[in-house]
Amino acid sequence: MQLLNTLLIGITAGSIYSLMAIAFVLVWRSTRVINFAQAGMALLSTYFGYEAVTRIGSFWVALPIAMLGGAIFSALVEVILMRVLVKHSSSGPIAGVAPIIATLGLLGLIRSVIAMIWGGQDLRIPPPVSNNGFTVNGEVLVFSPLKLLILITTLILMALLTLLFQRTNLGLSLRASAYAPEIARLSGIRVDLIRNLGWPLAGAAGAVAGVFQTVNGNGNFSPDSIEFLLLLVSGFIAAVIGGLDSLLGAVIGGLFLGVVISFVLMYLSGGLFFIAPFVLLLLVLFIRPQGIIGAKAERHA
């Protein structure tokens, strides 16, 4: 039973990592930028969700509001900041690096603004369903209705986004705008508008990750919550492990990372918690640099 519980703990944590990894993939696929501000956006969206829960009293209304808030904020970041940086950093000594550096600065700025508006105290979002484990043959599992909800939500979101990218003209335009923007413009695609769509989608996915990260713990969060920085690191590593161009890879990478960390904590040492993800990342990069599922983008451009 301990083995099963360890696996289920890893799957639940991995589902949340997958949601954050999906956000990284969406931004990368649309604008070829690594958005390290994603944790700050997820944290801000969680505050939006908190305000909705406090005022309306329904988690099921608060979650879409958090997603909408995250989507709008992410779109504004792309239009006001990232689009200008990408355009003006196409050449020079830090070509291509300036947008990434900017996202790190934006992460700190978001957390500071949140502290100014809401203060530094812990706030709480109660879980929407029970977090008491299911009972099987008289044994209580750690897997609960809440953890099942997190897993199902991750899979549904991945499926919907995959359909969007693979089965619609909009998805084709998003991919073309990322890989070959000049050719896409010559084909009549409004590249700037299309690129902007990847950011709000990522903001919505990150919002779900932030809210679920909160309710899957003790429900408390603050501007200094270490959980969101851990979510940032885990989500990025999961995206790289799975392949930065693959939504399916993001989900597989997140689940794989979650399970590995869970087994390391249970059977090896808690001190390896921060080391294991990076060791796993290096192993994957050595063996398969494009990730488990990731395609070689240049070949398919």
Which residues does each PLM region occupy?
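Membrane-interfacial amphipathic/re-entrant helices at transmembrane-helix boundaries
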Residues: 1-20, 48, 56, 60-62, ...
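Inter-helical junctions in multi-pass inner-membrane proteins, predominant
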Residues: 2-9, 164-166, 198-239, 268-271
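Membrane-embedded helix boundary and interhelical linker motif in transport proteins
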Residues: 30-80, 220-222
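Alpha-helical transmembrane segments within multi-pass membrane transporters and channels
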Residues: 57-106, 113, 252-257, 261, ...
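Transmembrane helix-bundle core of multi-pass membrane transporters
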Residues: 85, 94-167, 194-197, 263, ...
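Pore- or pathway-lining transmembrane helices of multi-pass membrane proteins that form conduits
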Residues: 86-114, 227-240, 269-288
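Membrane-helix/interface signature in polytopic inner-membrane proteins
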Residues: 160-199
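Cytosolic-side transmembrane-helix boundaries in multi-pass membrane proteins
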Residues: 179, 186, 190-193, 267-301
